[in-house]
């Protein structure tokens, strides 16, 4: 089985694309049990049995050679489970920060089916701490949440159900459809595609180019992560104000950061696009953005209400909410690769440099990007085990600067701020 990579193309050559989640499991665990649970969970998702194929003409696919007609919802058994490719769990005594700082610089071998790694870095009689690292082509933030749920179910002895890939299609991209869906901006991909195909003669890239990009970028950069555990009483206070002001928690947090930033900012938001509420592993997210400067002549409440209005306007407009999907898919796939390589510093061309500048892949990136997973729709307890800590660290994608991740599991609300700095 093959699935064309369309709306996820910008993740392919991005050099900072690892989604991280760290958890603490309360309960008597052992290495063999954790290994077995991880292997069972990887068998439950079709995408984790795939590899990414790059053709010479620049097209890219998820390819599952082990697909034997498994159906959504069927129990995962030894007779119908796919082979676990290169998704592994490791055990070491280290800090999670050291692990993440080391691993985000190492390219996932997606051509060999490596999408997911887990590192158990603490273990004692009371439980263990694990950090899960996933390439964004393995799925979005919710995908990793659902994988962790499956991992915990398997750890407690529960049988898992098989989950197929569900990708967001780019939809029709002919000239008329682009004009209808993109409006006046339809000329942008059309113009740049023409320049790219003329100047670069349909140049395409391969995994060697990807290796060079990682080496070039990470020898001059490193990430910093700030993690804030928000006490339940503080969360309740903020939620009370949100209810009183008729705003969301995301708008409240955004306003707080805008007050700190002190200037007009371009803020991006990841938006869940799972219309049917499925729990598959795949990229099923879109995005919106707003621009706003905190007005110090007005109260925090007034600023927060304005931020919420700007967000709501975009979220209630289906065309605005979906815009980024057909827009990015309208560019030549190899040109999308090229702007990521421009960002990494390993490739230069007049066309890709110009487009990278316009789209914020160079110096003028988004000031802030927020992903709020809200209250996670997974249990805390799994038999004798309990997830009593959960933290979500989104990647600093090529067009981002200050990346904020928010998650709540039970009484545990954690906010992270992920940034990249030059060294």
Name the predicted role of every residue range.
Residues 1-9, 85-87, 94, 138, ...:
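Non-catalytic, low-complexity flexible loops and terminal extensions
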Residues 90-123, 133, 160-177:
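Hydrophobic, well-ordered secondary-structure segments
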Residues 45, 135-136:
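Histidine-centered divalent metal-coordination motifs
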Residues 1-61, 67-70, 83-116, 262-423:
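Acyl-thioester-dependent acyl-group transfer interface
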Residues 14-33, 110-131, 212-276, 411-414:
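Gly/Ser/Thr-rich phosphate-binding loops and adjoining beta-strand/alpha-helix segments
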Residues 30-44, 130, 144-154, 238, ...:
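Structural preference for long, well-ordered alpha-helical segments in enzyme cores
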Residues 139, 152-159, 243, 257-262, ...:
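Hydrophobic/aromatic-lined pockets within catalytic cores
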